[in-house]
């Protein structure tokens, strides 16, 4: 029973020590600075590339074009000339 009672505090101690070592290593190598710069350039901040494949939708001129280009059908947004897939 003594072994079971010591396992949890020992595990927590090891996790705290290793996480602190990882933080120190990131500071020493400068990786922490790169991570901050990468977060500032993420799509969350409104930077949207028109050539990004995740933001692409098929172009169209009428609804029938979207019927064939979307898996479950869709309709054509005439203003943007893009398919709105369902």
Swiss-Prot record:
This is Defensin-like protein 259. It is found in: Secreted. It comes from the Eukaryota. Disulfide bonds join 60-76, 66-83, 70-85. GO terms for cellular component: extracellular region. Its main location: secreted. Belongs to the DEFL family. Keywords: Antimicrobial, Disulfide bond, Fungicide, Plant defense, Secreted, Signal. It comes from Arabidopsis thaliana (Mouse-ear cress). GO terms for biological process: defense response to fungus; killing of cells of another organism. Residues 1-25 form the signal peptide.
């Amino acid at each position: 029973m003594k072994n079971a009672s010591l396992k949890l505090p020992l595990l927590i101690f090891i996790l705290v020590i290793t996480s602190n070592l990882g933080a120190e290593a990131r500071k020493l190598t400068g990786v922490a600075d790169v991570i901050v710069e990468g977060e500032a350039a993420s799509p969350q901040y409104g930077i949207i590339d028109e050539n990004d494949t995740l933001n692409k939708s098929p172009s169209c001129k009428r609804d029938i074009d979207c019927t064939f280009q979307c898996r479950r059908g869709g309709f054509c947004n005439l203003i943007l000339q893009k398919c709105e897939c369902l």
